[in-house]
A protein has these predicted regions:
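Residue-level signal for functionally critical sites in structured catalytic/ligand-binding pockets
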Residues: 72-76, 107-108, 120-123, 173
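Active-site metal-binding core of divalent-cation-utilizing nuclease and nuclease-like domains
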Residues: 23-31, 39-40, 83, 87-117
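Short, basic/polar, glycine-containing "phosphate-handling" surface segments that engage DNA
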Residues: 1-67, 116-117, 121-242
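Acidic-basic catalytic patches of nuclease active cores, encompassing PD-(D/E)XK
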Residues: 65-95
Length: 242
């Protein structure tokens, strides 16, 4: 099956896992924390309905803002945090960046109950997007903060810290990144949220739910090797070597 909103760059996952994901390890109701005989498909359908509501509310809010506004607060509070909440995330704002090797990494949020996974959220209308350096300085610049793209910020942080996975998004695009300190080539899993919700791509949303539900992530950095997403990654590497 083709998933037009999903892009896999590098070796983070193999494309063939998308087609067999529903039958993969870790896809039973209990693996998502569902009790009482609930079905994963039913939970995904409910999350889809709620996510569409959040999307419409967010888009209406954008219509009221000045075009030059990056809409950072609105992107975080009206869209990304509620969306990830449907996937089981509890997210906490980070008032201070993390200092590593003399640099400060101003990651905006973390998942508070799942290994404190870094989640960096920028504005939907941020002109630089995820892959370019912002042209303007942040409103409250942090001494020692590296001036780089949102994607590069999270990637460099993961390469230097003990967390294995992180998320970066501007509300349009959502990416899962993995520590790639041993790799030169970019490696990430990307979901085009704009396309999913504008075109009504339920099948793509179901893959998003099954791959990025909070129960897929490491419970803590020490248990990263046992996490479902790392298992999928290692299985993908093994299948590629065969």
């Amino acid at each position: 099956m083709i998933y037009p909103s999903i892009r896999i760059e590098g070796a983070i996952l193999s494309p063939d896992i998308l087609g067999r994901l529903e039958d993969a390890h870790g896809q039973r109701p209990a693996d998502f924390g569902l009790d009482g005989g609930g079905k994963v498909k039913d939970e995904i359908a409910r999350a889809w309905a709620d996510a569409q509501d959040y999307w419409r509310i967010f888009q209406r809010k954008l219509d009221t803002l000045r075009p030059e506004t990056p809409a950072t607060t609105e992107t975080r509070n009206l869209w990304v945090i509620p969306l990830l909440g449907l996937f089981g995330y509890q997210i906490e704002f980070q008032a201070k960046g993390v200092e590593l090797n003399g640099k400060t990494y101003p990651i905006s949020h973390r998942a508070t109950h799942r290994g404190r996974t870094p989640i960096h959220i920028i504005g939907y209308r941020e002109a630089a997007g995820l892959d370019r350096k912002p042209e303007r300085a942040p409103p409250r610049p942090t001494f020692g903060a590296p001036r780089m793209s949102a994607h590069a910020l999270v990637q460099e942080y993961l390469n230097l810290h003990d967390e294995l996975y992180g998320l970066v998004t501007n509300g349009r695009i959502l990416r899962l990144l993995r520590d790639s300190s041993r790799l030169i080539k970019l490696s990430y899993l990307e979901f085009d949220l704009d396309r999913i919700f504008s075109d009504g791509l339920f099948a793509d949303f179901a893959v998003l739910y099954r791959l990025l539900h909070v129960t897929r992530l490491p419970a803590n950095p020490e248990a990263a090797a046992e996490s479902l997403i790392e298992r999928y990654h290692q299985d993908s590497l093994a299948s590629g070597a065969r």
